[in-house]
């Protein structure tokens, strides 16, 4: 049995802690034979291979008496880069418990568990449902809406350095002014309406006018401004920080994709430039 979970890009401008989209990078968990103890085989750096692995901790949180198994973990989702690496593991752990424990969890139940563990739904929701998911959590009341993201390309600049979510959150203010809150809320409304209508030009305008978090976090990613400048000059819809960063995401049409990649490559920035596609499916299980 294999459990496959997509990467995610969350926040998307003013969609702070609320909006995320599933993208074409993946965590794959191969479930092998029962064992006397948990073993997670992988080639990742500084990640436990025993029961202390987040995958196993999550599964045991859902069902504490699961029989230990030998597992293989493969992932091309970079760690601490703002592409939902921890969320993908949490969602995989929930699905692992669901399968081994024969729990028959609904998607809603998976989202509730994942949100409790992660703290907010913006990454875990698209990892569960796929595509674009707009979510809210208010006093433990979780609502989510899955919709189709308009056809487009996501060009990711993935820096060689990590940026922990905790560090990225530390630069955020404790409060916003009433004026800024109203302005950013209205911009978020326009962004959501534009995405639902398929109007990526207006959506891009709104994405770049966030007041909730990007203006505080962008200085932590020194490459952001030049990437935004070049991408805008070459017809991108928007440039934004993916999740808490440091990945910089460029949203553009398929037609503009190659030109933007070519121009960004000329900058010789310290990182990788990768074109990602929208993943329409969330977590899935392949049984052999």
UniProtKB/Swiss-Prot annotation:
It catalyses: L-homoserine + ATP = O-phospho-L-homoserine + ADP + H(+). It is found in: Cytoplasm. It is an enzyme of class 2 (transferase). Keywords: Amino-acid biosynthesis, ATP-binding, Cytoplasm, Kinase, Nucleotide-binding, Threonine biosynthesis, Transferase. Signal peptide: none annotated. GO terms for cellular component: cytoplasm. Coiled coil: none annotated. PROSITE patterns: GHMP_KINASES_ATP. Pathway: Amino-acid biosynthesis; L-threonine biosynthesis; L-threonine from L-aspartate: step 4/5. Its main location: cytoplasm. ATP binds at residues 78-88. The keyword Transmembrane does not apply. The keyword Transport does not apply. Pfam families: GHMP_kinases_C (PF08544), GHMP_kinases_N (PF00288). InterPro entries: GHMP_kinase_C_dom (IPR013750), GHMP_kinase_C_sf (IPR036554), GHMP_kinase_N_dom (IPR006204), GHMP_knse_ATP-bd_CS (IPR006203), Homoserine_kinase (IPR000870), Ribosomal_Su5_D2-typ_SF (IPR020568), Ribsml_uS5_D2-typ_fold_subgr (IPR014721). NCBIfam families: thrB. Catalyzes the ATP-dependent phosphorylation of L-homoserine to L-homoserine phosphate. This is Homoserine kinase. The gene is thrB.
């Amino acid at each position: 049995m294999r459990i496959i979970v997509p990467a995610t890009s969350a926040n998307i401008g003013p969609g702070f802690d609320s909006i995320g989209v599933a993208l074409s990078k993946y965590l794959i968990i191969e479930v092998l034979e029962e064992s006397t103890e948990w073993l997670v085989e992988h080639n990742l750096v500084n990640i436990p291979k025993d029961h202390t692995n987040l995958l196993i901790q999550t599964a045991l949180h859902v069902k504490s008496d699961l029989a230990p198994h030998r597992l293989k973990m493969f992932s091309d989702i970079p760690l601490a880069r703002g592409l939902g690496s921890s969320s993908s593991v949490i969602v995989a752990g929930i699905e692992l418990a669901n399968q081994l424990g024969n729990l028959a969890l609904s998607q809603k139940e998976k989202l509730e568990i994942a949100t409790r563990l992660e703290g907010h739904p913006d990454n875990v929701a698209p990892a569960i449902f796929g595509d674009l998911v707009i979510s809210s959590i208010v006093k433990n009341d979780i609502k989510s809406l899955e919709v189709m993201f308009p056809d487009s390309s996501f060009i990711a600049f993935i820096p060689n350095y990590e940026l922990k979510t905790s560090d990225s959150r530390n630069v955020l203010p404790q409060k916003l002014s009433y004026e800024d809150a109203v302005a950013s809320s209205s911009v978020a409304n326009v962004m959501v309406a534009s995405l639902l209508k398929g109007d990526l030009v207006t959506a891009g305008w709104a994405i770049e006018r966030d007041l909730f978090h990007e203006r505080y976090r962008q200085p932590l990613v020194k490459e952001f401004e030049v990437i935004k400048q070049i991408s805008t000059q070459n017809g991108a819809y928007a440039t934004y920080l993916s999740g808490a960063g440091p990945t910089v995401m460029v949203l553009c049409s398929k037609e503009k994709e190659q030109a933007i990649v070519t121009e960004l490559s000329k900058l010789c920035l310290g990182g990788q430039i990768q074109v990602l596609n929208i993943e329409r499916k969330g977590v899935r299980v392949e049984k052999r």
